[in-house]
Regions:
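Pre-Walker A (Motif I) flank of P-loop NTPase domains
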Residues: 2-5
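Hydrophobic anchor at the beta1->P-loop junction of P-loop NTPases
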Residues: 8
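Walker A (P-loop) phosphate-binding loop of P-loop NTPases
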Residues: 13
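Conserved lysine of the Walker
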Residues: 16
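Hydrophobic positions on the alpha1 helix immediately C-terminal to the Walker A/P-loop
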Residues: 19
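NTP-dependent small-molecule kinase module
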Residues: 22-24, 140-214
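ATP-dependent small-molecule kinase phosphotransfer cores
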Residues: 32-124, 197
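A glycine- and Lys/Arg-enriched "phosphate-lid" helix/loop adjacent to the NTP-binding pocket
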Residues: 100-169
Length: 214
């Protein structure tokens, strides 16, 4: 079993951070090193970009500006966190990566995918995840989950439902276009059931043990 670079993607309210933590804990029970990280974030620069992009002040940030800020944070994150972790044989579990840019700024805001891909290629140096886990949830359910905790609501959560539907559709299109590199999980189920489905999906593609302690 080779430690891999696995990214959790999906629309808002899918439970990415919860399921990432569950998977990390499960992998650690079999003795592997696991690095948990997120985008934007993972580095001092990334956390500063995260605060800027997700803050609730009334300053309008253009979609093109979002792309460039995210790319800058991603370039730092890849080289400072992800590549070194991979080099020492650790699992890297990341909450969002390049596909979120394609879904949010591409699908949601309508920016050209070809341009986005060129920027991401430069930012990542061509680094590609071994697998993506798409935690899919209908927009109405996902946003209701997010707004149930007012303290956690961010700028993206306040975008229109139509915007979030475009984002979800873009994620589903990305997964359908490359099914060997995606595990699509119905995230409307309970936390334990979703965790089991995530593990089964990874086991099918990354030769994980079929059964392990949860």
């Amino acid at each position: 079993m080779n430690p891999s670079f696995v990214v959790f993607e999906g629309p808002e309210g899918g439970g990415k951070s919860t399921q990432l933590a569950r998977l990390a804990a499960r992998l650690r029970t079999i003795g592997d090193e696991v690095v948990e990280t997120r985008e934007p974030g993972g580095t001092r620069l990334g956390n500063a970009v995260r605060a800027l992009l997700l803050g609730l002040d009334d300053y309008a940030i253009l979609p093109e500006t979002e792309v460039l800020l995210l790319a800058a944070a991603r370039a730092q994150h890849v080289r400072e966190v992800i590549v070194p972790a991979r080099a020492r044989g650790a699992w890297v579990l990341c909450d969002r990566f390049v596909d979120s840019t394609y879904a949010y700024q591409g699908g949601g805001h309508g920016l050209q995918i070809e341009q986005l891909r060129a920027i991401q290629e430069y930012a990542t140096g061509g680094l590609d995840p071994d697998l993506r886990v798409l935690l899919d949830v209908p927009v109405e359910i996902g946003l209701a989950r997010r707004h149930a905790d007012p303290a956690s609501v961010n700028r993206i959560d306040l975008a229109s439902a139509d915007f979030h539907r475009r984002v979800r559709g873009a994620f589903l299109d990305l997964a359908a276009a490359d099914p060997a590199r995606w595990v699509v999980v119905d995230a409307t189920a309970g936390v334990d059931e979703v965790a089991g489905l995530v593990w089964e999906g990874l086991a099918d593609r990354l030769t994980l043990p079929a059964r392990s302690h949860r």
